[in-house]
Amino acid sequence: MNASFDIAAANYDNSFTHTVIGKLQRNLVYRHLRGILEENRIQNILEINCGTGEDAIWLAKQNYTVTATDISPLMVAVAEKKTNLENLNFRQVDINRLPQPFPDEKFDLIFSNFGGLNCLTKTELGQFLKNASGLLTQNGQLVLVIMPKNTLWEQLYFLAKADFKSVFRRKKENVVANVDGENIKTNYFNPKEVTHLASADFRIRLLKPIGFFIPPSYLEPFFRSRPKLVSVLHSLENTAGKHSFLSKYADHYLITLQKK
């Protein structure tokens, strides 16, 4: 899997991070994440699947101590070139090897953004949640941004293209998703699946849709030249964010779990 994301590393910021849609979705995540950070005593943060380091840098600039990990050495290399913050450390780590790389460390919060966990199978996700519990301090927080199975934007997109076979593709296992020209096996999880897998070690604290009205990033070419439409969708998104039941229909959702 790391080789696939190595290929995506060079173009990821241009294809998502710096796009109109990418910025809007990331700001939605930050708005919810900021509230979580302010309400809890957070000092040490572990980021899983950090990509090119955009979120890790943002967290470190809020004066938290951040360890940011990714399976791809090229993603880590791109991230390291962006900053020299003393309270931020990037490491190449395979999520399936946790907690082995951190034998003597505990974290107040573990964070994974924009579908990094969708690269796991259901069994692997369950094991990750168990391992994450062991890495957290008492009452530690797990903040995950995951892609669900019922994204309405995607279903409408494939209907418009008359690609009826793909309308409900997210309901299948090991769906092949295109990431900057590279095919990645992807699994989609609705909020109830995640809370069920986590129920032995965590209780749910927060659930919010991310991208119910704001479209998926692959529609960036269409929306880039329509700023007024994007502005309207952004306003509607702020309203949608108040309704957790919309989470399984959004492009992503943010779920916060607290260690029992």
Functional labels for PLM-detected ranges:
Residues 1-40, 42-51, 58, 143-170:
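Conserved class I S-adenosyl-L-methionine
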Residues 52-98:
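Class I SAM-dependent methyltransferase SAM/SAH-binding core
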Residues 100-109:
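A short acidic, Gly/Pro-enriched loop at the edge of an enzyme's catalytic core
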Residues 126-138:
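A short glycine-rich, Lys/Arg-flanked "PGG" loop and its adjoining helix->strand segment in the class I
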Residues 183-201, 207:
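Short alpha-helix
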Residues 206-260:
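A C-terminal cap/extension of S-adenosyl-L-methionine-dependent methyltransferases
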